[in-house]
């Protein structure tokens, strides 16, 4: 079938199961070939082909609402709703988004990127439907990994209590990104092996209705037998107790089973949970055999071998550098423990976990719990390292503030993927952490200029005993600089001058140091002397150096790959105001007050005006123009 010609999913209504099987094979081949060039979330999407097709055949999108939790598994949905011709632009600048996008299609009714939000969104839509008196079906599709998120459980509790008509699709592939952990995962494992509970329950009810009633005694006995068999057949009937009608488990790759259960769910009043078993990566052997999450999301790859197409790294990844430095220090200090909310692979903690399994905690998709658990460990004189992506740290704001900072506990937070991350887009850009971390009392916040300084910052954080400390570091690899053999500690709140200058000064840190140095060198050719300062401590500021700069009265330019509102530049302005030095000329460069879309980091920096060219132009505007000499002077 020509998948690029699909306009909407109505063509599915008249197709037989055999034709749908052929369509599924075509879709899988399309995804494998397309993502081999662009990269993307191949594993999750190969696993939901039949489920997505079945949903669009049985229901009527966009009238009926599909809410894809996390959203990385929505490629098949995009294909069936007329966006196949755009797949060659997937996750590229101004191209097809890798997640549902409301302004991209009327079929995308809920935008996602972070996990565990679909059930709460669905509850809101169901409540609105009932208030308006309409009759659409609401169908959140949530994975077994996302179901471990606290927000999802809060929503289950409310939905079950309100008894709203809703069909929750539990896409159970036994993985989120990495293999799932926790008691809910264990419970779902029991359900997978328990058989079809709903069929047994219906048969029992039919049987009991045929037994002649002898007073109320037999009826009561029959009900007790039914309840006992329920718990015998399905250990831990969590969803039924929450108020849901539980259906399944169902083979998520069998159209016959999917159609039977989806039609049953349509006729059932109140909230229904359909438990669907799928195979992540189905149809492509390298992805299907993946046990640790390597094929969850990838770059380009060779179809025949499954080898990834990427240049040999000249330097270690930032995640690897940080985790391996922590691991090295853990050999000398048994109090060091590592915590990750479901990202052991992305955070490169596999080596730590293998060497120190009793000191490694993957808590699942539970950022709030991870932060407060770190606080608990710190109260017992342990040294917790919380490895967390910047975008997911947003979800633990209150726990960092209330449980870690307020108690002034020695927790080291490694803020991975800080700054622009590129193709994953606006839900994943790590640009807000400075603004929400720097106002927290007791918090130290820093970012290194390169991987050598990075390893020393990790050591500084581990040795720091005066409260919480956080280190930001970007996605990708280091710069390939020479690494010191001996680890050092860096004085808290100390900056360093990287390039001398007397006409103006740039205050910056991390990834934007390179463009600052390049701009300073360009202006040097024009006879302008610009100082570049590595403001590696975002909090506390180096007040001694700042005071010296203010005494010189020269213009100041701050640069940050983070939001300007409440950011590093704001802290410098606040300091200057408090010092009654408002006559100093100050300009700030950074991320504007908007969400930054997907695309390459270079393209995004160009779009927002954060390049060496714009830095140089800004400095030229700030510096006084030398007076022209007259003729004969």
From Swiss-Prot:
Alphabetized CDD domains for the sequence: TPP_DXS (cd02007), TPP_PYR_DXS_TK_like (cd07033)
Protein's GO biological process: 1-deoxy-D-xylulose 5-phosphate biosynthetic process; isopentenyl diphosphate biosynthetic process, methylerythritol 4-phosphate pathway; terpenoid biosynthetic process; thiamine biosynthetic process
SUPFAM superfamilies the UniProt entry points to: Thiamin diphosphate-binding fold (THDP-binding), TK C-terminal domain-like
Cofactor note (record): Binds 1 Mg(2+) ion per subunit.
InterPro entries attached to this UniProt entry: Dxylulose-5-P_synthase (IPR005477), THDP-binding (IPR029061), Transketo_C/PFOR_II (IPR009014), Transketolase-like_Pyr-bd (IPR005475), Transketolase_BS (IPR020826), Transketolase_C (IPR033248), Transketolase_CS (IPR049557)
Single GO term (MF): magnesium ion binding
HAMAP family, per database record: DXP_synth
Binding site for thiamine diphosphate: 72, 113-115, 145-146, 173, 284, 367
Pathway annotation from the record: Metabolic intermediate biosynthesis; 1-deoxy-D-xylulose 5-phosphate biosynthesis; 1-deoxy-D-xylulose 5-phosphate from D-glyceraldehyde 3-phosphate and pyruvate: step 1/1
Reactions performed catalytically: D-glyceraldehyde 3-phosphate + pyruvate + H(+) = 1-deoxy-D-xylulose 5-phosphate + CO2
EC nos: 2.2.1.7
GO annotation, cellular component aspect: cytosol
Function in brief: Catalyzes the acyloin condensation reaction between C atoms 2 and 3 of pyruvate and glyceraldehyde 3-phosphate to yield 1-deoxy-D-xylulose-5-phosphate (DXP).
Gene that encodes the chain: dxs
Entry keywords, A to Z: Isoprene biosynthesis, Magnesium, Metal-binding, Thiamine biosynthesis, Thiamine pyrophosphate, Transferase
Protein name per Swiss-Prot or TrEMBL: 1-deoxy-D-xylulose-5-phosphate synthase
Record: residues binding Mg(2+): 144, 173
Cofactor dependence: Mg(2+); thiamine diphosphate
Subunit architecture: Homodimer.
Family assignment from sequence similarity: Belongs to the transketolase family. DXPS subfamily.
